[in-house]
Amino acid sequence: MDQSRMTLGRFLAQQCPQDEKGKALALLLRQVGDSCRRIADAVAGGALREMTGAADNVNVQGEEQKKLDVFANDVLIEGCNWGGTVAGMASEEEDDIYTLPEGEPRGPWLLLFDPLDGSSNIDVNVSVGTIFSVLPAPDTGRDPVNEDLLQPGHRQVAAGYAVYGPSTVLVLTLGDGVYAFTLDRGQGEWFLTSSKMKVPEQTAEFAINCSYQRIWPAPIKRYIEECLDGEEGPRGKRFNMRWIASMVADLHRIFTRGGVFLYPADEKRPNGRLRVLYEINPMSMLMEQAGGEAFTGKERALDLQPEALHQRSGLMLGSREEVEVLRRYYAEQ
């Protein structure tokens, strides 16, 4: 694909089907892109826009919300609740499904999102991001109910994230490869900068929060110990550890240069910590489209059948060979 000044809008016009649903999908993803641009401006402004610090609210997860969590959530809802693109939305920050205002046409898609992943890093100026997923809506034209959103990840038609770092990058898949767009702040436009991104099959880098080591399951303890044994150990090579504590930032590094990201279920959180609908499903779709794998500790991540809007699970994803090693260790336990 010719990347010479390919805008997000032009890309979507070429890649989405030209029927009614395809045009609605293209518009929805442009709406998401516009919303992420607004969020990027707010993140960059930080304290100058009074966007740092807590919002004095607690979300459905029991987590203290940051001011930017609330702002990003509102921006995505306001940016995508018009134009007949969605039948409804769900957010990590909301208790229930968002129902469209009366009079707005119900569209063919459902939008699910984590409006600001890694928001605990905002006040220390570390990269954060937005994660999103698109699922088919019921064909009835009615407002969706919870069960309509409880679809396994392999039913996603699109997924992506925006990372708000030194540059702002939007990474997207429509089920035919992974593409990255960089925001030109001067023009306020997303331009294609990477096509058909691939995660290397082999790696010598892992990302995990080692503060949970005492409560890790046996397969994770074994895997990390063998990585740390270096050339003298059973893996026969030296591994490096990376951990940013921002899923989008950690995985963007892996999409760019390889690695494996581990956030397993453990003794304290036997059901895991990551949200299936808002984090695991979209990131797993992107990872498989980039040639990697995603595994929950029990099954392929995209085959997990969610049973609740805010269900959690463990997750290991990244370079194919490392995820296969982890699959084997879990099978042997």
UniProtKB/Swiss-Prot annotation:
Which reaction equation describes what this protein catalyses? beta-D-fructose 1,6-bisphosphate + H2O = beta-D-fructose 6-phosphate + phosphate
One GO BP annotation is: fructose metabolic process
EC numbers listed for it are 3.1.3.11
Stored InterPro entries: FBPase_C_dom (IPR044015), FBPase_class-1 (IPR000146), FBPase_N (IPR033391), FBPtase (IPR028343), Fructose_bisphosphatase_AS (IPR020548)
Q: Which cofactor does it need?
A: Mg(2+)
- The entry marks the following residues as binding Mg(2+) 2, namely 114, 117, 279
What does the cofactor section's free text say about binding?
Binds 2 magnesium ions per subunit.
Quaternary structure (record): Homotetramer.
- This chain's protein is named Fructose-1,6-bisphosphatase class 1
Protein species of origin: Alkalilimnicola ehrlichii (strain ATCC BAA-1101 / DSM 17681 / MLHE-1)
